[in-house]
Amino acid sequence: MTFWNEEIETMPEEELKAMQLKLLQELVERTYRDSGFYRKRMDEMGVKPEDIKTLDDIRKLPFMKKTDLRDNYPDGLFVKPYDELVRVHVSSGTTGKPTVVGYTQKDLDMWAESLDRGMTSFGMTNKDMLQNSHGYGLFTGGIGIHEAATKLGATVLPTSTGNTNRQIELMCDLPVTTIAGTPSYLFHIADTCDQKGIDIRKDTKLRKAIAGGEPWSESMREKLQNRTGIKIFNCYGASEFYGPMFLECEEQAGFHIWADITLIEILDENDQPVKDGERGAIVVTMLQKEAFPLIRYRIGDISSLEWTKCKCGRTHPRLQRLSGRTDDMLVVRGINVFPSQIEAVLGEMPFLSPFYHLTLDNENYMDRLVIEAELNEESLTEDMVELSKMSKELDKRLKEVLNIKAEVKLVLPGTLQRFEGKAKHVTDNRKYD
């Protein structure tokens, strides 16, 4: 059995929780000192750093929500000046405003540490070659996994997204043993290999995969594993944390949440803690973040947490497969998409009415987003050139905001259903079985 940091990864639960308390107290003290946002919130609740005497006292602290990220755009939540930052990542926000996250060198080191523990736990070593099919750039997935694998000593093939034929060619020609990507893209690669007559078992050295960025079921994982011979390990994270952070070990029995890095609460609908193993809303506190503190952040995911020791020997809590969301965020091909973002873009277009509908499906395991937008009476025309111009303008703007390609359909006035109460704008037909 191999560990990246055996002393920490196998530390008894009591010692881990004592470490968590010390780190939490230090976090609250420095954040109260350095962050106007948190200091104001804590003062409003009558809480001081010295009030945090036990781990249960975390419930005295205020929650942080996604709207707080929007309201403090771009850098109102930073507690370090830019000359102390080494990187900034940007991801989509709830109203078209992106979320801007700053990183010190220690932040990047801690991010890589978390991933390296996870990569080691499922058997990845410096002898592996990782084909990284996550997007690079402002998105955290590609660079985060790349740097962690490099620190591990593995060889990285930075293919990024797209150009599937080229990716498969390299996968066959080079000694690639591990691939990272979204579940839907891994299915797409498998489909394309079948079409080309390529047997992944025989024609490649690929045996492991890291899958993250979008939901999928256990039965889907089993289908892909049986089909390809690849053992697939799920990954969980978010840009607000650092990026992708937590992986499954060889047992595939949940995400190992490193207790010295992250404190996760699971709360019921009344914001009370649930029993160990019960499902509820995930609330995240990052214990060692420097540039962009995160205390009691409502990420919006639903899951359960177990502190039982894993068969792999690791003692840290395990987060189980996500079972839903507490908000209206959609995850499409690994990208966070909010209906409010789309609504804002549609509102910019003078030729559209306020009525729209989103439909999602995942035929052939690849997410497909169709946006139906209703023309207004003033813009109604039979001029195909003009209609094409409108469609292209809308298509371009949506791609700029969403960072993914959607299928846009302009429909006649009165086509879309009207609702007397709250309008239903989304139909999600995706199946994960």
PLM feature spans:
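Nucleotide 5′-phosphate-binding alpha/beta core
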Residues: 1-90, 95-113, 117-121, 270, ...
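Structured loop/turn residues at beta-strand edges in well-structured enzyme cores
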Residues: 53, 174, 204, 230, ...
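Conserved AMP-binding/adenylate-forming
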Residues: 207, 216-309
